[in-house]
Amino acid sequence: MRCPFCGGPDTQVKDSRPSEDSSAIRRRRVCPDCGGRFTTFERVQLRELVVLKRSGKRVPFDRDKLQRSIDVALRKRTVDPERVERLVSGITRRLESGGEGEVTSEAIGEAVMEGLKGLDDVAYVRFASVYKNFREAQDFQDLLGTLGGRLAGEALLPEEEEAVPVATDEAAAAPRRGRPSRKRA
């Protein structure tokens, strides 16, 4: 394998072991020319997949592009990288073992949304807003409704108001825990 640092034609494998989920082989390499060290991953590719885009164009499936799109949705979220790798590997395996040599970009997008929904709700909403091309706030509200949580500021229905406990004078006078609120001038 060519060295990514100096372009040297030969590198030596110093360590080789399976990845955490055993879906790849992790190899630690060193370049004898420049001494640069780097890691490579070797994965099984069941079949060559072709992605049929919305425009009708056909492009080869790119696992790295799938990884990047998930990483963008997860930016600044605290999700274990191993869980992300398992998600990407799982989606790739599902697509490759699907029996078809051609897969639509919609099928890939739906698989990513399904995976992100179980991984991180914020990343799910971020990805969905781009994938489904949200244009207005109502699109977000509709999607958030599918997550099952009440939206902030959403009005209660009359029958729900009765179920909400009313604060007593003691509870209202009790000191609040946590950080004090900061008043703005």
Curated annotation (Swiss-Prot):
Family the UniProt entry places it in: Belongs to the NrdR family.
Biased composition (Basic residues): 176-185
NCBIfam families found in the cross-reference section: transcriptional regulator NrdR (TIGR00244)
Statement: the UniProt record of this protein carries the keyword Repressor: yes
Keyword field: ATP-binding, DNA-binding, Metal-binding, Nucleotide-binding, Repressor, Transcription, Transcription regulation, Zinc, Zinc-finger
Highest taxon above the source species: Bacteria
ATP-cone domain: residues covered: 49-139
MF annotations from Gene Ontology: ATP binding; DNA binding; zinc ion binding
Compositionally biased intervals (Basic and acidic residues): 12-24
Cofactor detail note: Binds 1 zinc ion.
Stretches for region Disordered: 1-24, 161-185
Function: Negatively regulates transcription of bacterial ribonucleotide reductase nrd genes and operons by binding to NrdR-boxes.
Compositionally skewed regions (Low complexity) per UniProt: 164-175
Cofactor(s) of this protein: Zn(2+)
Mapped zinc finger ranges (unnamed): 3-34
Any one biological process term the GO annotation gives: negative regulation of DNA-templated transcription
Descriptive protein name: Transcriptional repressor NrdR
PANTHER family given in the database record: TRANSCRIPTIONAL REPRESSOR NRDR
